């Protein structure tokens, strides 16, 4: 096994992958609003090249930041000088990446069917796209593959449609991996796709849903970014579009929707991880979904699955104004997190985006809700920060299983409350 690790490290170096040796993830606890604002000042210091995994929000809420080795001393001195508490969550980011690569290397095999596909390891874009083709070939009466667009770099953007027939039926949308480094989401999407085919005709609740509604599943919403996380930079978040006025690449695709676009909760700096882009829907990965959802016209639920933090969120993120359906969505969220917790005891918080975490503008579920899709929710999957975006592959199946119970709860409510 040690030999595999050495091989994977050497391979990464040979391929020119970005190195994170000595980088640490710090958990900062801002006790009051003044300390939150002080941390935001730190966030604005671009020369430190900080990567906020969980940004500043409510006082007392965890703030997780990856600090490059050359910036560690400066950041720690800054925090200590302001009396702001912090602790080290990840001692060395590269060591986790090496373990992840070793596990993937050891698990490599070409699946000949979806039954032999390894759901307990992370997969590349090509492997996931091959899986889609296998699934469609095995279940042609239930599953079809739609191409809804092409990414900035020209990759096909695929959606799996699960349907038992009929035209323009009420539908449920699920997307995963809009932030490319959140690998647990794409892996969960693959598991979901297989689960749909297994449970139809076997599980009465899911069968009732698919007998009346269609489900559209976008497993890799940001294919360029996802491919880049495998080839160059495991922690890449954004799209890969080029902004003519900047050397920095990419847009935060979950700040690019036409819902409070450009307001507080996104950045106008192309070098920021939360850069909103030049205009709403500038990213083809976003525009493809917008056009598809609008053209369809009969979506009743819109679920966007992210990681991490163990949260179930509903609109709004860009304004403190409560949505008209707050009472109902809050109850649905409560029921969903209770169902999710019932399997492994994983606890989720729930509420509106802006009151539960922080202000975020230009988000997908704010847009979908404003389009009249009442049941709009965002999941933030495991964990709460021990591994962050580098969740071990051993947690893929448990995460997918428990998340499925929450998703199924929302689907059932949608079916029973069609509007």
From Swiss-Prot:
Record's keyword annotation contains Zinc: yes
Instruction: Name the EC number(s).
Output: 3.4.17.1
Organism superkingdom: Eukaryota
- Binding residues for substrate: 179-182, 237, 254-255, 307-308, 358
The way its activity is modulated is described as:
Inhibited by interaction with the S.magnifica carboxypeptidase inhibitor SmCI.
- Cofactor binding note from Swiss-Prot or TrEMBL: Binds 1 zinc ion per subunit.
Q: Where is the signal peptide?
A: 1-16
Q: Which stretches are tagged as propeptide in the UniProt entry?
A: 17-110
Q: In which tissues is it expressed?
A: Pancreas.
Q: What does this protein do?
A: Carboxypeptidase that catalyzes the release of a C-terminal amino acid, but has little or no action with -Asp, -Glu, -Arg, -Lys or -Pro. Catalyzes the conversion of leukotriene C4 to leukotriene F4 via the hydrolysis of an amide bond.
Family that this chain belongs to? Belongs to the peptidase M14 family.
- Quaternary data: Monomer. May form a complex with proelastase 2.
Name this protein carries in UniProt:
Carboxypeptidase A1
């Amino acid at each position: 096994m040690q030999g595999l690790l050495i091989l994977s490290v050497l391979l990464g170096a040979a391929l020119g992958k970005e190195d994170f040796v000595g980088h640490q993830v710090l958990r900062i606890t801002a006790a009051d609003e003044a300390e939150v604002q002080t941390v935001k000042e730190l966030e604005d210091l671009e020369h430190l090249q900080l990567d906020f995994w969980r940004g500043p929000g409510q006082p007392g809420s965890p703030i997780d930041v990856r600090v490059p080795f050359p910036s560690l001393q400066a950041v720690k001195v800054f925090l200590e000088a302001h009396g702001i508490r912090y602790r080290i969550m990840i001692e060395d980011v590269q060591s986790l990446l090496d373990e992840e690569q070793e596990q993937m290397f050891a698990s490599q095999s070409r699946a000949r069917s979806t039954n032999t596909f390894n759901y307990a390891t992370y997969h590349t874009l090509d492997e996931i796209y091959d899986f889609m083709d296998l699934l469609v070939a095995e279940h042609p009466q239930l599953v079809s593959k739609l191409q809804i667009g092409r990414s900035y770099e020209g990759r096909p953007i695929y959606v799996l449609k699960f349907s038992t027939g009929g035209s323009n039926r009420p539908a449920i949308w699920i997307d995963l991996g809009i932030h490319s480094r959140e690998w647990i989401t794409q892996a969960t999407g693959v598991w979901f796709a297989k689960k749909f085919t297994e449970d139809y005709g076997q599980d009465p609740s899911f069968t009732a849903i698919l007998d009346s509604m269609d489900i559209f599943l976008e497993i890799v919403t940001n294919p360029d970014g996802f491919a880049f996380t495998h080839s160059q930079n495991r922690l890449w978040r954004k799209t890969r579009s080029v902004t003519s006025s900047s050397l920095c690449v990419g847009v935060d695709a979950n700040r690019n929707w036409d819902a409070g676009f450009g307001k507080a909760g996104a950045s106008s700096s192309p070098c920021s991880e939360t850069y909103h882009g030049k205009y709403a829907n500038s990213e083809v990965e976003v525009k493809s979904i917008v056009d598809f959802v609008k053209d369809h016209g009969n979506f009743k639920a819109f679920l966007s699955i992210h990681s991490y933090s163990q949260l179930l969120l509903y609109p709004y993120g860009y304004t403190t104004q409560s949505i008209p359906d707050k009472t109902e969505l809050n109850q649905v969220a409560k029921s969903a997190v209770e169902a999710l917790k019932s399997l492994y005891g994983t606890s989720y918080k729930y509420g509106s985006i802006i009151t539960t975490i922080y202000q975020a503008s230009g988000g997908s579920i704010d847009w979908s809700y404003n389009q009249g899709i009442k049941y709009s929710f965002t999941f933030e999957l495991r964990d709460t920060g021990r591994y962050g975006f580098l969740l071990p592959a051993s947690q893929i199946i448990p995460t997918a299983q428990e998340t499925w119970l929450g998703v199924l709860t929302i689907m059932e409510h949608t079916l029973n409350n069609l509007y």
